[in-house]
Curated annotation (Swiss-Prot):
Transmembrane segments: none annotated. Its cofactor is Mn(2+). Mn(2+) binds at D13, H201, H203, N237. This is 2-isopropylmalate synthase. The gene is leuA. It comes from Listeria monocytogenes serovar 1/2a (strain ATCC BAA-679 / EGD-e).
Amino acid sequence: MKKIQFFDTTLRDGEQTPGVNFDVKEKIQIALQLEKLGIDVIEAGFPISSPGDFECVKAIAKAIKHCSVTGLARCVEGDIDRAEEALKDAVSPQIHIFLATSDVHMEYKLKMSRAEVLASIKHHISYARQKFEVVQFSPEDATRSDRAFLIEAVQTAIDAGATVINIPDTVGYTNPTEFGQLFQDLRREIKQFDDITFASHCHDDLGMATANALAAIENGARRVEGTINGIGERAGNTALEEVAVALHIRKDFYQAETNIVLNQFKNSSDLISRLSGMPVPRNKAVIGGNAYAHESGIHQDGVLKNPDTYEIITPALVGVDKNSLPLGKLSGKHAFNTRMEEMGYTLTEQEQKDAFKRFKQLADAKKEVTEEDLHALILGQSSESADDFELKHLQVQYVTGGVQGAIVRIEERDGALVEDAATGSGSIEAIYNTINRLMKQDIELTDYRIQAITAGQDAQAEVHVVIKNDKGAEFHGIGIDFDVLTASAKAYLQASGKSKTASKQADFEEVK
């Protein structure tokens, strides 16, 4: 039985999804959940890319105790040095170095010859090997690279000290047959194939990321890279939950085992969906809302008689609990904290106290507090505590058929209160115009989404927004409240605050 390692890049490649920006606290929360999930390697970020990313990688390296943490680096000594510094507190640090090997990338992006690329690989892998015990090399755009040159580049990296070779399908170009053949070619040509770890990193542009990853495993790969829910730039990445469950359900075929704790997938998926603002499609394999629903009468009858008739995956396998009991206003701290742990949250003692206080307030307003309410409660607490701006007062003047007005008062992190007013063709526009005046930013709203957290008239509203600033950068915000307008204001204020903070950091870097 072969052992397959799981390499999660939700915090690096997943964050490249337009509009997804995790702050440090959110990244640590995700990393801790990935650790509970049994992920072998967490790619925490790209340390050289920005001071913020460096600090995130550093914080995650310090927080994670039971799996490896890695950082991305180009074939540049400064990148490698920065990664080493960020990962110095990691229990098991690794580094992930990449350089393109396809002709189109070498000619138009790198402006390097094949000989120069090989020389760079040799030098920088050797340099990194002096600092890291585990060095992973990725020949970017491998699936569009000349096969003979790709093999030469891989051999060069191994000879220089690479311990892991990752084969990226960077633009989602290949198919399972071709990708499997590529690994067969590598096995045939690379003399050390069985002595090091080969991995795959697939994108989903043609909808074949999971199938390609499984084809790689069939043909010798012992590490799979991907993200939770398959998030990532463009069409996304290999969805790790799909690969893990496929290996488990079809163990007879793949003859593979993993360290993954399968019943933590639902918690992981929910957490990342809420923090990223990307809802999981209801028909998504493994963790979608309809994954275990049966509409057909014939199917329903069969499942009732024997679930094996139409269910190859049980909900409990991935942590979907259909019998979760709601909490209420009489529930105590022990029951509340136990439920938090079951849902995958790791809270400090103070965070537990704050969360329980908010829970009691929520329980007074609702007859039953469901798991969805609890996710929203923790998410709201986490996001609001990290914000530089807090909504203190909102007043909307509504006239049917007329111009709407809004008055907004916010508190800045230093305690200063500022207030302004503006109008709009609707209540939401009036609120957002007012916040734009307060924040003194040129902001474009690119996405607005509202959903009820639970059913019933006492449901809380959860609003997600994505904005774009004048530099073209996108930021996500979330707001939760019983009042839709208040939730909308909180979401927009949070996204605007992220944009303002990012602009300040960019200005600082430019001056420095």
